[in-house]
A protein has these predicted regions:
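Short, well-ordered secondary-structure micro-motifs within conserved domains or adaptor modules
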Residues: 24-32
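A short catalytic or substrate-binding loop motif that flags glycine-/basic-rich loops and adjacent residues
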Residues: 21-23, 46-47
Length: 143
């Protein structure tokens, strides 16, 4: 296991999204127009709005792992490089990400993070049920 810090241009390519181009599932999307620093992942092949930069791995990093690496590194980068409500596309080239170059470690990390996110979603759904019950109880008692 060897953790490396590299410039994004060494491990990925990026471009401003082209509204007419279909991008592959798993690419990372960085919102650069009217942004609050959103980093998303494309869930299925499709078109992407031009307010995003599309980041694709050059092969050293698995797409899901690249997404999590960018998402982790992005907040301080965003606060340093944003200009008003926007982020200059050219500044994305200054982003540094930390990653493990062992693909098996990347796969394990992805499995563990996805399991945690699945559990988080289940808890959020359970909390929503309790909130709905609470709302119903207030309606019954105070109406």
């Amino acid at each position: 296991m060897v953790m490396r810090t590299r410039n994004i241009t060494e491990v990925a390519q990026f471009e401003r999204a082209n509204k007419r181009k279909i991008y592959r599932k798993g690419v990372t999307l960085i919102q650069v127009s009217a942004t609050k620093g959103d980093v998303l992942q494309l869930e299925e092949d499709g078109l992407v709005e031009s307010k995003y930069v599309v980041v694709e791995s050059k092969g050293q990093i698995l797409p899901d792992y690249l997404f999590f690496a960018i998402k982790h590194a992005f907040p301080p980068f965003f606060h340093k490089w944003r200009t008003g409500l926007n982020l200059q596309v050219s500044n994305i080239a200054k982003l540094e990400i930390c990653f493990d170059d062992d693909v098996e470690v990347q796969k394990q990390f992805i499995r563990e993070i996805k399991a945690i996110l699945k559990l988080k979603k289940a808890y959020e759904e359970e909390i929503k049920v309790y909130e709905d019950v609470k709302k119903d109880m207030f309606t019954i008692f105070f109406n």
